[in-house]
């Protein structure tokens, strides 16, 4: 359901998968609607972590 969250949900998902270290999860980011993540697995993870930490963690923590 988090995938339907949009930008916030997308970053949140990116941070979770990125932290897990599963490159396969990069495909999940594309489903969220963030083509940037799908553009590059390595680059996407790094960018996702930075963006996720700043926005995803705050929003995600509340949802958890």
UniProtKB/Swiss-Prot annotation:
Region annotation (Disordered) ranges: 1-64
InterPro entries from the UniProt entry: Orthopox_C10L
Segments of skewed composition (Gly residues): 49-64
Top-level taxon of origin: Viruses
Listed Low complexity bias regions: 23-34
Similarity field: Belongs to the orthopoxvirus OPG024 family.
Protein name: OPG024 protein
Lineage, broadest ranks: Viruses, Varidnaviria, Bamfordvirae, Nucleocytoviricota, Pokkesviricetes
Gene: OPG023
């Amino acid at each position: 359901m988090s995938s339907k969250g949009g930008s916030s949900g997308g970053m949140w998902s990116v941070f979770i998968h990125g932290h897990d270290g599963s490159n396969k999860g990069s495909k999940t980011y594309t489903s969220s609607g963030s083509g940037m993540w799908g553009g590059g697995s390595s680059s996407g993870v790094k960018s996702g972590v930075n963006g996720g930490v700043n926005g995803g963690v705050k929003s995600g923590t509340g949802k958890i």
